[in-house]
Regions:
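Feature activates predominantly on carbohydrate-active enzymes
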Residues: 378-565, 583-597
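Active-site neighborhood of glycoside hydrolase catalytic domains
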Residues: 559, 564-652, 657-664
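Aromatic, loop-rich ligand-recognition surfaces of beta-strand-rich domains
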Residues: 11-12, 29-33, 66-127, 131-184
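Short tryptophan-centered beta-strand motifs in secreted/extracellular beta-sheet-rich domains
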Residues: 467, 525, 529, 820, ...
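Flexible glycan-contacting loops in extracellular carbohydrate-active proteins
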Residues: 908-941
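Extracellular glycan-recognition modules
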Residues: 795-866, 939, 943-949
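Short, aromatic/His-centered strand-loop micro-motif at the edge of beta-sheets
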Residues: 865-887
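Acidic, contiguous N-terminal accessory segments
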Residues: 264-401, 409, 413-428, 633-641
Length: 949
């Protein structure tokens, strides 16, 4: 979703409905009184209840107008045997009720009802609920006004879930019980309708505004179906779309509110005969595409690639709008065609190399693939595409990114089919959310540029389009054991993983000497990613997480505590200027590593210095970066860090990583664009407490616009252009003294696991039950359109795919079995020298990006069989004899490696459990035996994988 102009209407005409059904409301902006005011606050209202947790938490606390103070609420007794409770309001006279607001302290009620009575004896259920409130602020709208003198909230059951502590706290707790005679005007809004013109076009008419109000159209969740101006595009399948409006009282009697409607949008108009013919001959929607396509209209028969496959690339079609941008897009289109060809060849889809020609649609013949620009009037937007599959395959998009996604879909269809065939039909495909992301901390643990490329390629396969790279950080000082003094804290591990010219007066460099990306290779990575349809978002994190900077410039470190020295003292102007210089270097037009980045992350999380100084610093860095034409992203912290300065929301994207540091509703109402990165659902800390994502939870409960924990849930409307999407993140917190030996392959494995479910939910696909879930999770979900995904972790034909040989780096990835017959010469030097070290004997080795990568017959520190990778060495409890043949078998799995000697299990190193040493080993095959740097002997090697030899 992009920033869009909002349409305003103060009145309007209703037209005939064409397939338009209202299914529900989605409201933001709380009702604060309206014309009638809160009747529960009236004189003479009596509140009673069945029980209290303690005397001070009585029923009258629920009508005192205080909805924030914990001591000002009603709380029932904590009865584990009987969780049924009630709170009742008695009014001095009969009232009319249309609207009730319940402000829960906890959302643990799972069965309850609102009841009304004229005499307190005969009760009528006004509304009943069988699930927990969606949010702690619950609004109950009655279809018609009800006369009553008594209102009662009856609770029948309370959750017993351990995750929210309901198993311990069976009491019900309510801040406020509010009662209103009038509904907010938003609930009076007429439903929007679709109108058809004589020319055949369709559009969504603005709903009529109630008298004294104006209505603003905010947008649709599927803007490729209903555009920002109300245009209803020609879809090929019926779609359900949620649209949102803002209702504003022109006299200010009510706070502005948002209201949503769910609309069924029919496919483009067809005659009954056409529909009947389509249904008769329609191919089913192919199931091999992940995430599944948004719209499908089946044809009859199959498309088969030609024996000498050809791709026609229509570069001229991208020159129509802008010569400058068109030339750039034309080159990217050529690069995308080459990428398609290369990937198809590498994963065995094509038996022969595809020949790429420049041409037009007229040049396309049976068996060909065509790539070209679509008309802007089709509403495909930034990433949508169409794929018309007949005896040829025609892929069109308004933007080159859409072309990439069309190519990915075709690759998946071809790999799922037989003999390079695909069922004929038409695809119209597009995402639900703009940001579908993944991020990785490369600072606390180095991550090679090769692994970033592997991740990029797999992200693109799943149409994940946003790749965040966290470039600087340090060991968490609070858990480092190095905080006896500021000077000791300064010795903790830290790294800045990007080439920089910055040096202190002693000549010490900011750039990590262990491993860092050069400016040119990082710039090339950003540029290459665009060909894959992915935006790279680089991050320099300040003013916290900055020990790599304050270690060089200790005079700029915040000194409020020993643990604060990894934060920059913003009171010092010289320190702020230093950060500005760092950004100017990274953004430099000709040489900056970020010069081609469209979005950059300026950090800004977990700062414990003075709040207003922080906010002014944030605004200053934001303005500097946006001055170079780039959008800014940051870690939301404005709810937790006080101050009066609010940075402009224009082109500013906020990662909502903690609802304490940045309340999503508060940030939404402040106008910021939001990305769901909530830590308890989307953070991975390999080897630590968040070792892997909970795929079951993501499948069953999580949604990109849903922010929730054990006690709170807030929904940000998906129809709003401010709700950008979601991203998950790997944080290498287990570093320094907490290092658990996590390898790059461990990172990759955890990165890949949730991709199917997350890509499906972010693209907008219904997803199927994961293969490893039991039947208790319910049947597979999906819709009759075929928009269902696959939740198992399917094999991806790129990167560290776990299918055997990792060809790009000549290595075997887990799960593998390496069988070696090894003969160490009798005269081989294996005795320890005077320094206590042994002459290493290397059986296999490869070129590591930043450390040795080898399997030893004799490990130099111990003389035992062992291996080293990524700066960490492991040895088995076994010493290889000289002068005899020995059969060694190495079995590598996630986290562990087991050594067998002559078919007898000898030793296992490592574990796959959190907080335990990991020893995952990608076995190098680049140089084996006498090809290595030193091996005195002979060997034979046989490699087997769990699926493939």
């Amino acid at each position: 979703m992009k920033n869009r102009k909002k349409t305003v209407l103060t009145g309007g005409l209703l037209v005939a409905v064409l397939g338009c059904v209202i299914l529900g409301f989605f409201l933001t902006g709380y009702f604060v009184g309206g014309r009638s005011g809160n009747l529960a606050r009236g004189k003479g209202v009596i509140a009673t209840c069945d029980s209290v947790e303690q005397e001070s938490l009585s029923a009258d606390m629920a009508i005192d107008g205080d909805d924030t103070t914990l001591a000002s609420r009603w709380s029932s007794e904590n009865n584990w045997e009987d969780a049924s409770h009630y709170i009742q309001l008695e009014f001095p006279e009969e009232i009319s009720v249309s609207f009730v607001v319940l402000k829960w302290e906890r959302r643990n009620v799972v069965s309850y009802a609102l009841e009304g009575s004229l005499d307190g004896q005969k009760w009528e259920i006004l509304q009943k609920f069988d699930t927990a409130p969606a949010e702690r602020h619950q609004e109950i709208v009655l279809d018609e006004a009800v006369r009553a003198r008594f209102l009662r909230l009856s609770i029948y059951a309370v959750s017993k879930e351990e995750s929210d502590y309901s198993n311990l706290y069976q009491n019900v707790s309510l801040y406020e019980f509010e009662v209103y005679a009038d509904k907010p005007a938003a609930y009076l809004l007429e439903r929007p309708v679709i109108e058809s013109s004589k020319e055949g076009g369709r559009r969504l008419a603005m709903p009529q505004a109630p008298a004294g109000y104006q209505v603003v159209f905010i947008g649709a969740d599927l803007e490729q179906v209903i555009g920002a101006d109300g245009t209803v595009y020609e879809t090929i399948q019926e779609k359900e779309v949620t649209v949102g409006y803002r209702v504003e009282d022109v006299k200010g009697r009510e706070e502005p509110r948002e209201v949503s409607f769910t609309i069924q949008v029919p496919a483009g108009i067809q005659t009954a005969e056409q529909e009947e013919e389509e249904e008769r001959r329609q191919n089913a929607c192919p199931e091999g595409v992940i995430p599944a396509v948004a719209e499908w209209c089946g044809g009859e028969g199959i498309f088969r690639l030609g024996k000498a496959p050809r791709m026609i690339v229509d570069t001229d079609s991208f020159l129509r709008e802008s010569v400058t941008e068109g030339k750039a897009d034309a080159q990217i289109l050529r690069d995308m065609a080459d990428l398609f060809n290369r990937q198809c060849e590498s994963c065995g889809i094509l038996q022969e190399e595809m020949t790429i020609y420049e041409g037009t649609l007229e040049d396309v013949r049976a068996g060909d693939v065509y790539l070209g620009c679509a008309e802007k009037s089709g509403g495909l937007g930034e990433e949508g595409y169409t794929c018309d599959i007949t005896d040829k395959c025609v892929i069109k998009a308004e933007n080159v990114t859409g072309i990439r996604w069309g190519c990915v879909t075709l690759m998946q269809l071809l790999s799922d089919g037989e003999d390079n065939t695909v069922p004929q039909g038409r695809i119209r495909d597009y995402p639900l959310y703009t940001v579908r992301g993944f991020g990785i901390d490369v600072a606390r643990k180095p991550v090679s540029i090769e692994t970033l490329y592997d991740m990029l390629e797999v992200m693109s396969w799943y149409k994940m389009n946003d790749f965040s790279i966290h470039l600087n950080d340090n060991t968490i000082l609070a858990t480092s054991g190095l905080t006896d003094s500021p000077e000791q804290a300064m010795t903790a591990d830290s790294a800045f993983r990007l080439e920089s010219d910055m040096r202190n007066e002693e000549g010490e460099a900011l750039t990590s000497q262990e491993y860092a990306y050069t400016r040119e290779e990082f710039d090339r990575f950003i540029e290459t990613a665009r060909i894959y349809g992915v935006t790279v978002v680089p991050e320099i994190d300040t003013p916290a997480h900055s020990l790599s900077i304050t270690r060089l410039y200790p005079e700029y470190a915040l000194r409020t505590s020993n643990e604060s020295v990894d934060q920059i003292d913003l009171e010092k102007e010289e320190a702020v200027i230093l950060v500005e210089q760092l950004w100017q270097e990274a953004l430099a037009e000709e040489t900056g590593a970020f010069r081609q980045a469209r979005i950059v992350n300026i950090g800004m999380d977990e700062y414990y210095g003075e709040g207003e100084q922080y906010r002014q610093f944030l605004t200053r860095i934001n303005d500097l970066v946006q001055g170079t034409g780039k959008a800014v992203r940051l870690w939301g912290s404005l709810s937790h860090i006080d101050g009066t300065t609010w940075p402009s929301a224009r082109n500013l994207q906020m990662n909502i990583w903690s609802t304490v540091w940045a309340d999503p509703r508060e940030m939404y109402e402040a106008g910021y664009s939001l990305i769901n990165m909530q830590n308890n659902h989307l953070y991975i800390i390999p080897g630590g407490g968040y070792d892997r994502l909970d795929i079951r939870e993501l499948y069953e409960n999580w949604e990109p616009n849903k922010f929730y924990d054990y006690n709170q849930m807030e929904m940000i409307p998906s129809y709003s252009p401010q709700m950008l999407g979601a991203s998950y993140m790997i944080w290498n917190d287990m570093s320094g003294s907490l290092d658990m030996g996590i390898s790059e392959y461990d990172l990759y494995e955890r990165f890949r696991e949730p991709l199917a479910v997350l890509s499906g939910k972010l693209w907008g696909a219904s997803v199927s039950k994961p293969g490893d879930m039991d039947d208790e999770t319910g049947d597979e979900t999906g819709d009759e359109t075929g928009r269902s995904g696959i939740l198992e972790v399917p094999e991806v034909p790129f990167g560290m795919n776990g299918c055997g040989l990792y060809a790009d780096r000549e290595a075997a990835v887990p799960d593998y079995e390496i069988q070696m017959k090894v003969y160490l010469n009798p005269e081989a030097s294996v005795e320890a020298g005077q320094d206590g070290k042994y002459q290493e004997q290397v059986l296999a080795q490869g070129d590591g990006a930043y450390a040795k990568w080898a399997f030893y017959a004799v490990e130099p520190q111990t003389g035992r069989v062992g291996f080293t990778r990524e700066g960490r060495t492991y040895t088995f409890d076994y010493t290889l004899p000289r002068g005899e043949w020995v059969n060694l078998t190495l079995v590598g799995t996630s986290g562990k490696v087991t050594l067998y000697v002559d078919n007898q299990e000898t030793d296992t190193v490592g574990s796959d459990e959190p907080f335990k040493e990991h020893a995952t080993f990608v076995f190098p095959l680049q140089r084996v035996g006498r090809q290595t740097t030193h091996f005195e002997g002979e060997m034979e090697l046989d490699f087997r994988n769990g699926r493939e030899d």
